[in-house]
Curated annotation (Swiss-Prot):
It is found in: Cytoplasm. The modification N6-(pyridoxal phosphate)lysine is found at K196. It catalyses: O-phospho-L-serine + 2-oxoglutarate = 3-phosphooxypyruvate + L-glutamate; 4-(phosphooxy)-L-threonine + 2-oxoglutarate = (R)-3-hydroxy-2-oxo-4-phosphooxybutanoate + L-glutamate. It comes from Burkholderia multivorans (strain ATCC 17616 / 249). Binds 1 pyridoxal phosphate per subunit. Belongs to the class-V pyridoxal-phosphate-dependent aminotransferase family. SerC subfamily. One of its GO terms (biological process) is pyridoxine biosynthetic process. This is Phosphoserine aminotransferase. Its cofactor is pyridoxal 5'-phosphate. Homodimer. Its main location: cytoplasm. It holds the Pfam family Aminotran_5.
Length: 360
């Protein structure tokens, strides 16, 4: 029996994608091979690879000024790879810290430069807001400005993206990429692990403006140097072939759904239903300012936290899984990525109301 999976990542995949992958597992398109067995330089995998790159460009409307790369290491690795590729001769990078992941990025950058905290969304209640651009205090000559546009743990999503002029804007988009249209031209670099909205764990997407490819530090490993990866069409070393294949199937699924505009409308509907349920109750609480609440990751707390384990057990009995909040913040978290259907959110909301009544 399939359940409703609210995991923050690795996360739910579209059932259509899983079924297609199952059908093609032993024999991809008459090749007599599984994608797992293919040479990454053979014509069969090259067709998968090129189609995935092209479909991602189409979905995000990536301009010709930017390169799309497939790497490995996830968002965590990019916290080191970004400074190694962008610092050049500069010694400072600016960070807008809106949650746990941008804090990790800030901390990792200390190994390579002197990071400057340009703004923070931390309050007495934790990370609950995204500082407006007017609050940002940028340094004099930063190599780049970094932000995480959706904080998976804290549930803070940044929607207003400023124009920084000549300063490259770097965004960790791991947990909301492909959930809504984006103006890619505003960014110098976008990066994200695949295991939330793109596909399965193993591949990392990097979209980088081409004029930024000449800034890498000499210590940057060649496999992570964007210029080298770009020059080799993301095939400098053996890529995560099956993860790219699954990502390609997800891209095709998204196109069949009507693209990112249609997906965004669905995601708004799902998020509104869940937040309205939380806000309409004194039993559940979300601490994030409404204007910057994440559409993808919805943390919430029970007024009586002694009931947390009962809540999770009851949810599991109804086929609602992976609702436990991150260990650093506690409570609950429902990750409602693209592949989580509206029916899943409706089932969760119904359970939340039933549980509240039972506890009254």
């Amino acid at each position: 029996m399939r359940v409703f999976n609210f995991s923050a990542g690795p996360a739910a995949l579209p059932e259509e994608v899983l079924r297609q992958a199952a059908d093609e597992m032993l024999d991809w398109h008459g090749s007599g091979m599984s994608v797992m067995e293919m040479s990454h330089r053979g014509k069969e995998f090259m067709s998968i690879h090129e189609a995935a790159l092209a479909d991602l460009r189409e979905l995000l409307d990536v301009p010709a000024s930017h390169r799309v790369l497939f790497l490995q290491g996830g968002g965590i690795a990019e916290n080191a790879i970004v400074p190694m590729n962008l610092l050049g001769s500069r010694k400072t990078a600016d960070f807008v810290v809106t949650g746990s992941w941008s804090q990790k990025s800030f901390n990792e950058a200390k190994k390579y430069c002197t990071p400057h905290l340009a703004a923070t969304g931390k309050t007495d209640a934790g990370f609950t807001r995204a500082p407006a651009f007017a609050e940002w205090q940028l340094s004099d000559d930063p190599a780049y400005v970094h932000l995480c546009t959706n904080e998976t743990i804290d549930g803070v999503e940044t929607f207003e993206i400023p124009d920084l002029g000549d300063v490259p804007l770097v965004a960790d988009v791991s947990s909301h990429i492909l959930s809504r249209p984006m103006d890619v031209a505003k960014y110098g670099v976008l990066f994200g692990g695949a295991q939330k909205n793109i596909g399965m764990a193993g591949v990392t997407v990097v979209i980088v403006r081409e004029d930024l490819l000449d800034r890498a530090l000499s210590i940057c490993p060649s496999a992570f140097e964007w210029k080298t990866v770009a020059a080799n069409n993301s095939l400098y070393n053996t890529p995560p072939t099956y993860a790219i294949y699954i990502a390609g199937l997800v891209f095709q699924w998204l196109k069949r759904q009507g693209g990112l505009g249609a997906i965004e409308a669905r995601n708004i509907e799902k998020a509104k239903l869940l937040y309205d349920t939380i806000d309409g109750s004194s039993f559940y609480l979300n601490k994030v300012e409404p204007a910057v609440r994440s559409r993808m990751n919805v943390p919430f707390f029970l007024a009586d936290e002694s009931r947390n384990e009962d809540f999770l057990a009851g949810a599991k009995a109804r086929g609602l899984l992976q609702l436990k909040g991150h260990k650093s913040v506690g409570g609950m978290r429902a990750s409602i990525y693209n592949a989580v259907p509206l029916e899943g959110v409706k089932a969760l909301v119904e359970y939340m109301k039933d549980f509240e009544q039972r506890c009254a």
